[in-house]
């Protein structure tokens, strides 16, 4: 409770600045919830009482009205207990971490594809050394076809297929960890020079 302590004369509770920071934090959390798709929202531990307010905020397109509705959503969120809000924050953080890891894995596969197209057999040999179960002939043919398609300005069918094969290989054999090892080895050899 806010106010002065009668015995000590000190202020009790959070300061106005602290209350504003907490209110803005809940407002930001509400914005994140509104930005989610219905499928993503269903995975979160959001109380049923907040769902209509979130849906209403999504429906409103006028800037000022949308902001007013977000403030109304934040007001209802402040009525929820701190454990509920903490559970929502934790779930959102876990979702963003998972999404970041997935994006990083895709970027690693794309780097492998670009290395295969740029360096050819050298990169292919490194890939096959790390992952002997990979089909050398299929990879070599896809690299050759992708280079040919790029030179002739054709649709990138083999380029996409090469990505699919590398992604499947990464999921089956853990290309992500092998790729980071190879990149670490490359940077170490470059540092030695």
Curated annotation (Swiss-Prot):
Keywords carried by this UniProt record: Cytoplasm, Ribosome biogenesis, RNA-binding, rRNA-binding
Keyword rRNA-binding carried by entry: yes
SUPFAM superfamilies cross-referenced by the UniProt entry: PSPTO4464-like (SSF158710)
Single annotated GO MF: ribosome binding
Subcellular location: Cytoplasm
Record's GO cellular component terms: cytosol
InterPro entries: DarP, DarP_sf
Keyword Cell membrane (UniProt): no
Compositional bias per record (Acidic residues), positions renumbered to this chain: 178-193
Biased composition (Basic and acidic residues): 1-10
Region (Disordered), start-end ranges: 1-20, 171-193
GO BP: assembly of large subunit precursor of preribosome
SS bond partners: none
Function: Member of a network of 50S ribosomal subunit biogenesis factors which assembles along the 30S-50S interface, preventing incorrect 23S rRNA structures from forming. Promotes peptidyl transferase center (PTC) maturation.
Family the UniProt entry places it in: Belongs to the DarP family.
The protein, known as: Dual-action ribosomal maturation protein DarP
Source organism of this protein record: Xanthomonas axonopodis pv. citri (strain 306)
Organism taxonomic ancestry: Bacteria, Pseudomonadati, Pseudomonadota, Gammaproteobacteria, Lysobacterales
């Amino acid at each position: 409770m806010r106010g002065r302590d009668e015995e000590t004369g000190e202020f009790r509770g959070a300061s106005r600045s602290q209350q504003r920071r907490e209110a803005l934090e809940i407002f930001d959390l509400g914005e994140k919830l509104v930005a989610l798709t219905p499928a993503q929202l269903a995975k979160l531990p959001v109380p049923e009482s907040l769902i209509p307010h979130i849906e209403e905020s999504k429906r409103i397109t006028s800037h000022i009205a949308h902001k007013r509705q977000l403030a109304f959503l934040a007001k209802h969120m402040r009525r929820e207990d701190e454990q509920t809000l903490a559970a929502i924050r934790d779930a959102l953080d876990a979702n963003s971490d998972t999404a970041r890891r997935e994006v990083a894995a895709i970027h690693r596969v794309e780097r492998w594809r670009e290395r295969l197209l740029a360096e050819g057999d050298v990169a292919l040999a490194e890939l096959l050394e790390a992952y002997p179960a990979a089909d050398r002939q299929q990879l070599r043919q896809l690299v050759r076809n992708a280079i040919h398609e790029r030179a002739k300005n054709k649709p990138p069918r083999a380029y996409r297929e090469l990505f699919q094969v590398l992604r499947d290989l990464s999921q089956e054999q853990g290309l992500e960890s092998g790729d980071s090892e190879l990149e670490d080895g490359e940077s170490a050899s470059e540092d030695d020079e």
